[in-house]
Amino acid sequence: MRPGTSITPLSLTRRLGLFFALVLSIALASMGAFAYYSLAAQLEARDDEVVKGKLEQVEHFLREVDGVQGVPAAQHRFDDLVRGYSDLIVRVTALDGRLLFRTGNDALLEGTDQAAVTGKSSLMFQSADAVLGRDGTRATVFVAKSGEDRKQVTARFRTTLVLGTTVGVILTALVGAAITRRELEPAHVLIKQINRISVERLSYRVDMPPKPTEVRDIASAFNAMLQRLEDGYQKLSRFSADLAHDLRTPLNNLIGHAEVALSRDRTGPEYVALVEESLVEYQRLARMIDAMLFLARADSANVALELTELQLNAELRKLSAYFSVLAEERSVVIRVSGDATLVADAILFQRAINNVLSNAVRHAWPNSMIDLVVRREAAHCCIDITNVGDPIPERELSLIFDRFFRGDRARSNSSQSTGLGLAIVLSIMELHGGDASAVSGLDGKTRFTLRFPLNGAEASARVSVGRPSQDRPVVG
């Protein structure tokens, strides 16, 4: 193989076909070997039984003859004994070595003596001493059967076995590949459909094949992934559009201030006023950039939580005191009730409560009340922040935690909001393993609920027990 070249891996169809062939070849080879050796053993046992039976018959004949002289007269009886057995050899030898009788296929023993014959592995033989007639003369009987027929049968069986195994393996490989190709056809169709998907066609969904179940599950999971991608892409598109819109307003204001300043000579107080107006826009941009950086770190799980035990009643009273001046200006009263111990990041906890509470104060009706209630719910510690004001439309409740989302009321005073406060709240809750929700009724009561897990935040967070909370809430 030349340097730089790579071996193309076999397709799943070919690999399964080869796998089927390998498994079948091992199975057939094992069964064939068992059948072959079983047949050989049975043939040997049959030949051994034949030799043993003929030996007993010869011994019986010899006992009936009249001594050594009577053996030739019984030639016809010995010939009948081996008739039909062309591979059978019978020898009767006197104790002095004289050959008294032999019959059968002498060619099998030609050029050999009895000792040599007994060493031939292809012959089945037995020998025994026999008594000739009533005079008590003894002789040696040797009966052997050639193994050529047995070898031919086993050879034919072996050839048939090898040929059948080879053909079976080849057919199995071909049939297995064909079946695999047919069963994987939905996968090829799925691949073609996936190749049609592009950024402009994220709404496209692949077909759900009725079978096989595995491909159907893949198609279902792929469609679910496409749905998530489409949702994420749409959110990213909205985020980009909203970001451009929200950055354009302060930048246009700054450009306008600069153009006004350069249009003619200004007095000192006029320049101070222009700089103060520009500073407001700079601060708004800074808040927006800070919020976006926090959300980016939260999305990438790049925020390490400093966990500490918090007494929620004390923390909420501290936050309500911070907003007391703004609440008094709007004739709003903030009440805190309930208490619990919570393990959370103190600064992020304050930031989440601050963002919700600032919205509650800003949108509360004059002479109304804001309730901060701590309660337990199963394995969660819940903080309810309820105010009375204009109800939030149902269609906006599902979008209220989205980035850059601002309702109609907020957009009437856009300089006071970046549209990222509640998105930051949701990110903080998710970092702690909790969630945030909002409900609004026609009676004007709007309740935001923050659910913190009682067992602390993510296990990967760094724990710092006893870390003091900040006296001043973190805004934004």
UniProtKB/Swiss-Prot annotation:
Histidine kinase domain span: 242-455
Catalyzed chemical reaction(s): ATP + protein L-histidine = ADP + protein N-phospho-L-histidine
Main function: Member of the two-component regulatory system CzcS/CzcR involved in the control of cobalt, zinc and cadmium homeostasis. Probably activates CzcR by phosphorylation.
Any single Gene Ontology cellular-component annotation: plasma membrane
Origin: domain of life: Bacteria
Primary residence: membrane
Topological domains annotated Periplasmic: 37-158
Modified residues (Phosphohistidine): 245
EC number annotated for this UniProt entry: 2.7.13.3
Transmembrane domains' residue ranges: 159-179
Protein name in UniProt: Sensor protein CzcS
Molecular functions (GO terms): ATP binding; phosphorelay sensor kinase activity
Keyword RNA-binding: no
